[in-house]
Design a protein with these regions (language model features):
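Periplasmic/ER-lumenal interhelical loops and adjacent helix-loop junctions
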Residues: 2-97, 142-149
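Polar low-complexity intrinsically disordered regions enriched in Ser/Thr and small residues
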Residues: 9-11, 49, 194, 204, ...
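Hydrophobic, Leu/Ile/Phe/Ala-enriched alpha-helical segments that form helix-helix packing faces
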Residues: 59-62, 168, 215
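Contiguous transmembrane helix-bundle modules in multi-pass membrane proteins
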Residues: 71-80, 90, 96-213
Length: 215
């Protein structure tokens, strides 16, 4: 604590607000599953497409043991939306969500906990999740500043994961649903990476120095 307080940045004068800019909130939903859209304030999300169905399973399943995890997810999400937490977790200097890595760990844990239930999801629950993802998609697309290919790809992949698990979980070959779901998960990883690094997306690779330019 003393190290944070004694840091030179703490003595600097920064603008503190009770809410983030409107662009932050407009792009927040889309930024959850796309690397091309960032709300700002070092809030780097861009999770795999499977995160969206996993969160839906968490809330659509009557499992009392998951109640603390639901509260943690809701609380952490609320903290990302309130600048005071970004300011506090950044050493009381300026608003930045550097702690977002912890939010990523929560999402990863939710995926791990709900994976088995997702792979054997019932038709009724699957349809409910598809509707929820459709509503989420509509809200994200309408709110974000600029629609990109990455968000479309991620949303379609999320829907395909649910459809595959819903239709094929009763197949005679019990492994077919989880295997196809894993393939879609890796496709989402590849898609996010491609859009992040390629010139058709964020073109992040252009920020690197070529080997020949290094002294």
């Amino acid at each position: 604590i003393l190290a944070f307080i004694g840091d030179g940045r703490s003595s600097e004068s920064y603008v503190h607000t009770w809410i983030y800019s409107m662009d932050y909130y407009r792009n927040f939903l889309a930024s959850m599953i796309t690397c091309q859209t960032k709300p700002g304030y070092l809030t780097h999300l861009g999770y795999n497409a499977v995160a969206l169905p996993a969160v839906c399973v968490l809330f659509f399943t009557k499992n009392k043991s998951w109640r603390p995890l639901r509260l943690i997810f809701l609380g952490a999400t609320a903290m990302l939306l309130i600048p005071a937490f970004g300011w506090a977790f950044n050493g009381f200097s300026y608003m930045a969500n550097r702690w977002v890595w912890a939010y990523g760990m929560i999402i990863a844990y939710i995926v791990a906990v709900t994976w088995q239930d997702l792979c054997k999801i019932s038709t009724g629950k699957g349809l409910g999740i598809i509707i929820a993802i459709a509503v989420y998609s509509l809200a994200a697309l309408l709110m974000m500043n600029e629609i990109n290919h990455n968000i479309i790809f991620s949303l379609i992949t999320a829907l395909l994961i649910v459809i595959v698990c819903m239709i094929l979980n009763k197949s005679a070959k019990k492994l077919i649903a989880p295997v196809l779901a894993v393939i879609l998960v890796f496709a989402s990883f590849a898609g996010n990476s491609a859009y992040f690094f390629s010139s058709h997306g964020n073109n992040h690779i252009a920020s690197y120095v070529s080997y020949g330019a290094v002294n």
